């Protein structure tokens, strides 16, 4: 008899679009374990710091909240410097024994920059102002890139692209949380 492996938590889709003086991050609300939807209205996108940074996460929820707290601490150390705060968090994430075990990715943005942060220490800025993470991330990214040159605004692109991702990815739903900031 074989010991069964614990079911793994799946899914989410987080997307950011920077266009027309706005930056928007949106995410779906589905949390699944194995083939079962555990929750359909999770809030994976929120404002950080003093409300001048927005972020979304994919991965283990408790891990992501730990990382959000650490990022907020770095933002207090380096106010108005999202890139510096993100790099400092990434250094800690790679070198701290506890943080290294955290399984999450984050998209964060302020008025000037959008970044993706990974547990391998990557801090990446998208070339086109569009970036996505999570199980439906590639679908949302492709849809957003297809729409970026249209007359649609950033929030409409995020909503449309996440709807398309929800049509394709079984770990993504249409219960969206959207946050936006004025961008430079």
From Swiss-Prot:
The active site is at residue 12. GO terms for cellular component: HslUV protease complex; proteasome core complex. The keyword Ion transport does not apply. Na(+) binds at residues 166, 169, 172. InterPro entries: ATP-dep_Prtase_HsIV_su, Ntn_hydrolases_N, Proteasome_sua/b, Proteasome_suB-type. GO terms for biological process: proteolysis involved in protein catabolic process. Protease subunit of a proteasome-like degradation complex believed to be a general protein degrading machinery. PANTHER family: ATP-DEPENDENT PROTEASE SUBUNIT HSLV (PTHR32194:SF7), METALLOPROTEASE TLDD (PTHR32194). This is ATP-dependent protease subunit HslV. It comes from Nitrobacter winogradskyi (strain ATCC 25391 / DSM 10237 / CIP 104748 / NCIMB 11846 / Nb-255).
């Amino acid at each position: 008899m074989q010991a069964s492996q614990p079911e793994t938590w799946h899914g989410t889709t987080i997307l950011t679009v920077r266009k027309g003086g706005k930056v928007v991050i949106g995410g779906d609300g589905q949390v699944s374990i194995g083939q079962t939807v555990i929750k359909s209205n999770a809030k994976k996108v929120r404002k950080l710091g003093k409300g001048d940074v927005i972020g979304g996460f994919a991965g283990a929820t408790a891990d992501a909240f730990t990382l959000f707290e650490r990022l907020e601490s770095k933002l207090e150390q380096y106010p108005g410097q999202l890139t510096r705060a993100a790099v400092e968090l990434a250094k800690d994430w790679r070198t701290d024994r506890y943080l290294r075990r955290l399984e999450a990715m984050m998209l964060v943005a302020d008025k000037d920059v959008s970044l993706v942060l990974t547990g391998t220490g990557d801090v990446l800025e998208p070339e086109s102002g569009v970036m996505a993470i999570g199980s439906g991330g590639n679908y949302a990214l492709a849809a957003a890139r297809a729409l970026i040159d249209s007359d649609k605004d950033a929030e409409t692109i995020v909503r449309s692209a996440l709807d398309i991702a929800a049509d394709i990815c079984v770990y993504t739903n249409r219960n969206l949380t959207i946050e936006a900031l004025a961008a430079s």
